[in-house]
Amino acid sequence: RVLFRSGVISNFEVTERMIRYFIGKSVGFHWFKKPRIAVCVPSKVTDVERRAVEQATKSAGAGQVFIIEEPVAAALGAGLDISRPCGSMVVDIGGGTTDVAVISLGGIVVSTSIKVAGDKFDDAIVRYMRKNHRINIGERTAENLKVILGTACADTPESKLTVKGGDMVSGLPTEIEVSSKEMYKAMSECVTAIVDAIFYVLEQTPPEL
């Protein structure tokens, strides 16, 4: 996570080393021909951010670099036929950004990208636990709560999970039982932001799609 902030590179040198490692794992460290590599970026990155991704990938040993917007890659990965003349909506919730796009005829018709995604959900859960239970938890614990109990629906059947953390008053280790209803409350603001982004894209989509 220290390599990327809001879906773009924040540490060029370490990112380059990471990509070089992946190239080595994929095609070996002693390749004779530089590989062609496709890299996904958020749909609303700037030209400067896009060039940084391309430069880091080439510095890591790539011959050709193809930059693909994340919604297009997500659609292809989901098996959607993006070449059809009808619209397909993709909501790609990543770590740093959520991309919402309507795709048709092989390209993005309308899209938006917001800096609310997995990391923001984790941060919201950490804040909720501090405010409502006076307990400090780490990012990994917050992510586990998100994955196991996280929900965007208020009427989801309730489930519970016991988590460990540090008591903010005594400073001692403690554990507490957390419910899915609490996670709904903790995540609701982030969910609302994503829903608003979806509505925005729908409003901008041409009626014929």
Predicted regions, residues:
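Nucleotide/phosphate-binding catalytic cleft detector across ATP-hydrolyzing
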Residues: R1-I93, A101-L209
